Amino acid sequence: MNLEYVQVVQKFNQVLLELTKKVCTVVGGSKPTYWYHHIRRVCSECPSMPMSMIGPYLNVYKAQILTKDKNFFMNFDPAHNEYTFIIQKLKEAARNMPEDELEQYWVKLLFLLKSYIKCKPFIN
């Protein structure tokens, strides 16, 4: 396991936990640790997920955390880009968080997740 991989994983975990606490605090959602482990688990179970699917998955995480709808993720098929519905849900749920602040966290998380997947030793 190379050092770059370890560093990216550590940073990914740190930012993901920070983001989750922030979002859950703002919208009064579930306990941050629950969402942190939930998202982390799904990411670790799909290490070879194509880059084109990361965006839809992240949007689902964002919508699920903000709307606190536990069934939303389970019913979502990433093969179908339901961006319009997800974005609408986000707009409804994110009223209490400044849009630029929310976007800043998710841009950072998306970058880290891409790095995390790219440097996994068994991923091309």
Curated annotation (Swiss-Prot):
Keywords carried by this UniProt record: Late protein, Virion
Main localization category: virion
Source species, domain of life: Viruses
Localisation per UniProt entry: Virion
One GO CC annotation: virion component
Induction: Expressed in the late phase of the viral replicative cycle.
Family: Belongs to the asfivirus H124R family.
Record protein name field: Uncharacterized protein H124R
